[in-house]
């Protein structure tokens, strides 16, 4: 009797364990499938290469913010405003940060269409010319007679005529040569160009490459109303998936906030995905970028865009002759998707 009872007990225990294990495996599998189905695969381009200033996207990925928002994000190095515009409007990427002024130049000249900004990234333009001590450039006027390098698609290069006009530079006396995000700093360090198009936050990275003190000529000294980068998507994607756009934006801005709050940690996360990263230079870039992202004094929330200020930016570009009359903020920005205070 005892043996029969023991046998029944063992069989029941084994069966229960088997059912429990099966149920557990099924649950894990179902959860995995559910998560897999809920994650939309999207491609995100960085603004320009994989420098510290773009670490916030990798932070959002590493911390699971994108996954929590329903996205499986493939982050690829961007090639500047013009290139990013082409790739996003062609449907080869869903999101990318680009300089708002570059977007206005493209839209106002009729070079591109089918895109829309859905969030701000930086509240002031970070466009600049960076040179090195000893190159004979300490003021904008010194750029005359010099050779500068930048990508043809870069907003720094494309906005230069307006900057030159306001800074009293004869743009016809400045020579430009082509470069890529990956080669520009090496070109400057090797003395193959007197200056390069960069963002102001690139100063520490330039110095780490060139082993010399960098001199920065910020465009914002003369163009104070211009925004920096904004988050771009295609008009079609924004129209068809407004809730997804808002979810992605929220996740990205969360990564941006974390990166500004803790640059050192963000730099280490960037290095995990981009092994060639110099963590010290990357963290320094993020530290410099902080005031451009959010001004505590103004109380403007991260991601905000103001239509009146964008209109003033358009007026500046029209006044310098770089874009034709007729462009409005609503043609390039979907304010219904822009984060509110």
Give the label of every model feature segment.
Residues 310-341:
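Conserved C-terminal helix/tail region of periplasmic/extracytoplasmic solute-binding proteins
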């Amino acid at each position: 009797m005892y043996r029969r009872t023991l046998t029944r007990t063992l069989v029941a225990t084994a069966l229960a364990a088997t059912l429990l294990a099966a149920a557990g495996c099924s649950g894990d599998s179902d959860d995995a499938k559910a998560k897999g189905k809920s994650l939309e695969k999207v491609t995100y381009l960085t603004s320009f290469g994989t420098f510290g200033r773009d670490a916030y996207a990798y932070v959002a990925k590493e911390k699971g913010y994108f996954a929590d928002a329903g996205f499986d994000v493939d982050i690829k190095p961007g090639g500047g405003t013009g290139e990013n515009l082409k790739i996003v409007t062609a449907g080869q990427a869903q999101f990318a940060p680009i300089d708002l002024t570059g977007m206005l130049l493209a839209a106002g000249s009729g070079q591109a269409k089918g895109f829309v900004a859905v969030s701000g990234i930086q509240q002031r333009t970070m466009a600049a010319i960076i040179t090195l001590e000893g190159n004979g450039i300490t003021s904008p006027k010194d750029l005359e007679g010099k050779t500068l390098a930048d990508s043809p698609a870069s907003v720094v290069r494309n906005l230069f005529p307006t900057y030159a006009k306001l800074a009293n530079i004869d743009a016809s006396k400045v020579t430009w040569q082509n470069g890529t995000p990956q080669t520009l700093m090496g070109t400057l360090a090797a003395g193959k160009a007197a200056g390069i198009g960069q963002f102001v936050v690139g100063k520490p990275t330039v110095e780490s490459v060139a082993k010399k003190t960098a001199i920065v000529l910020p465009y914002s000294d003369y163009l104070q109303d211009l925004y920096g980068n904004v988050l771009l998507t295609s008009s079609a994607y924004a129209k068809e998936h407004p809730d997804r756009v808002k979810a992605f934006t929220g996740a990205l801005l969360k990564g941006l906030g974390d990166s500004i709050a803790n640059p050192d940690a963000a730099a280490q996360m960037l290095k995990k995905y981009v092994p060639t990263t110099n963590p010290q230079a990357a963290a320094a870039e993020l530290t410099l970028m902080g005031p451009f992202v959010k001004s505590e004094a103004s109380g403007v929330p991260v991601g905000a865009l103001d239509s009146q200020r964008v209109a003033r930016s358009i007026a500046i570009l029209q006044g310098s002759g770089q874009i034709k009359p007729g462009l409005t903020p609503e043609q390039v920005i979907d304010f219904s998707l822009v984060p509110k205070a």
